[in-house]
């Protein structure tokens, strides 16, 4: 099944919260997730000239702000992180940013999706051309929600998968190799364990 870009939010078997963002693409397969510094992971085209073909293929997909991690499928990563840095509650930062940025104005009206986690809390959110939702979710060890731009842009108990892996690297590889979701390109994970651990593939 092709669901495009998606987020996976859950806990490892050891009970450590994580979020993984995976790029799946038919149109722009030549992208990489790159750790830019201790607080940021960016999605970049391998050929930098592709940046001028589509405004939505280059963005920060992960941003760390103190004890909060933000992961999204677009430039709203920075907006959400900035609002949290200014002191907005997570729910409000998500709501404001998704409503302000709205869905992507491309040929598909691609939704914007987002996850924000701390060691104690997890929120999911999305905005489409017909809906917007923010929800605080409870996480269970070994299980994870997924939220995608195509076919699975919902926050529901019906969109849950089992996840294996103890480290950020292992979780990233698991999500990257998850065969049910087609056209993997690159992925990045934030794992909460003695602070934040970042991994990309």
Swiss-Prot record:
Swiss-Prot/TrEMBL GO biological process terms: 'de novo' IMP biosynthetic process
Chain segments annotated as transmembrane? none
Q: Could you tell me what this protein is called?
A: IMP cyclohydrolase
Q: In which pathway does it act?
A: Purine metabolism; IMP biosynthesis via de novo pathway; IMP from 5-formamido-1-(5-phospho-D-ribosyl)imidazole-4-carboxamide: step 1/1
Q: What is its EC number?
A: 3.5.4.10
Q: What does this protein do?
A: Catalyzes the cyclization of 5-formylamidoimidazole-4-carboxamide ribonucleotide to IMP.
* InterPro entries according to UniProt: IMP_cyclohydrolase, IMP_cyclohydrolase-like, IMP_cyclohydrolase-like_sf
Which organism does this sequence originate in?
A: Methanococcus maripaludis (strain DSM 14266 / JCM 13030 / NBRC 101832 / S2 / LL)
User: Hey, which family's this protein in?
Assistant: Belongs to the archaeal IMP cyclohydrolase family.
**Origin superkingdom:** Archaea
High-level lineage: Archaea, Methanobacteriati, Methanobacteriota, Methanomada group, Methanococci
Q: Which reaction does it catalyse?
A: IMP + H2O = 5-formamido-1-(5-phospho-D-ribosyl)imidazole-4-carboxamide
- Group of enzyme by EC: hydrolase
């Amino acid at each position: 099944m092709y669901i495009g870009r998606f987020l996976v939010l859950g806990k490892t078997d050891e009970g450590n919260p994580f979020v993984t963002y995976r790029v799946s693409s038919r149109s722009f397969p030549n992208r990489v997730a790159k750790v830019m510094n201790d607080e940021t992971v960016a999605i970049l085209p391998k050929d930098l000239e592709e940046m001028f073909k589509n405004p939505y293929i280059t963005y920060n997909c992960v941003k760390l702000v103190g004890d909060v991690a933000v992961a999204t499928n677009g430039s709203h990563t920075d907006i959400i992180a900035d609002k949290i840095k200014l002191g907005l509650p997570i729910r409000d930062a998500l709501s404001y940013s998704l409503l302000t940025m709205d869905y992507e104005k491309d040929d598909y009206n691609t939704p914007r999706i987002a996850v924000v986690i701390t060691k104690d809390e997890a929120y999911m959110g999305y905005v489409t051309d017909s809906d917007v939702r923010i929800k605080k979710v409870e996480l269970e060890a070994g299980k994870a929600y997924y939220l995608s731009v195509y076919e699975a842009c919902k926050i529901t108990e019906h969109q849950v998968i089992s996840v294996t892996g103890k480290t950020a690297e292992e979780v990233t590889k698991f999500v990257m190799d998850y065969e049910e979701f087609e056209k993997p390109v690159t992925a990045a994970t934030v794992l909460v364990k003695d602070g934040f651990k970042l991994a990309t593939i």
